C-alpha cells in the first residue's frame, strides 16, 4: 500500500482527479469502509460499482470528459479484474493508460503476471498500443 499511497498523495498535490470504485465484501461499501482512511474518497469522487470495467454503470467517463482528461492511471485490486477491465475499457474509449504494476494486486503472483502481460503485450492491439507499464515512482504529474 505504500506505493499506492505515495501515488495518491502526489495526484492530490498536483490537483489531479482521483476517482474510486467501492465494492466491499457485501457490495455495499462506503468511504467509511476504506481500509486506510488516508485514501478516503472525498464527496463526488466515488461510486459503488462492481464488475471489472468501472466505466459500465458509473459516472467515470463523464467526469473524465468534463475535465478534458486524456490519460488515466489504473490502481487497485484485483489486477486481473480492474487492471484489465478498466485498463482495457479506458484504452478502447481512446484514453492513454498508465499501469503502475506496483499499485495493482491480485490473489496470487500468477494473476498479477498474467494481467501485466495481457495489458502490455498479450491483449488486443487497440489496448496494448495505449498502455504504458511502469512503476509508481516513475509517474509524474
Q: For the regions a protein language model found, what residue spans apply to each?
A:
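Active-site-adjacent betaalpha module
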Residues: 13, 26-141
Amino acid at each position: 500500500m505504500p506505493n499506492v499511497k505515495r501515488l495518491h498523495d502526489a495526484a492530490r498535490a498536483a490537483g489531479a482527479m482521483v476517482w474510486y470504485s467501492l465494492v466491499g465484501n457485501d457490495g455495499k461499501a462506503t468511504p467509511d469502509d476504506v481500509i486506510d482512511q488516508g485514501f478516503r474518497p472525498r464527496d463526488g469522487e466515488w461510486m459503488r460499482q462492481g464488475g471489472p470495467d468501472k466505466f459500465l454503470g458509473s459516472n467515470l467517463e463523464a467526469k473524465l470528459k468534463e475535465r478534458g482528461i486524456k490519460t488515466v492511471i489504473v490502481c487497485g485490486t484485483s489486477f486481473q479484474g480492474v487492471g484489465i477491465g478498466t485498463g482495457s475499457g479506458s484504452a478502447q474509449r481512446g484514453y492513454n493508460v498508465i499501469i503502475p504494476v506496483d499499485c495493482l494486486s491480485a490473489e496470487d503472483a500468477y494473476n498479477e503476471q498474467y494481467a501485466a502481460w495481457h495489458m502490455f503485450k498479450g491483449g488486443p492491439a487497440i489496448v496494448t498500443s495505449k498502455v504504458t507499464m511502469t512503476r509508481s515512482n516513475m509517474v509524474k504529474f
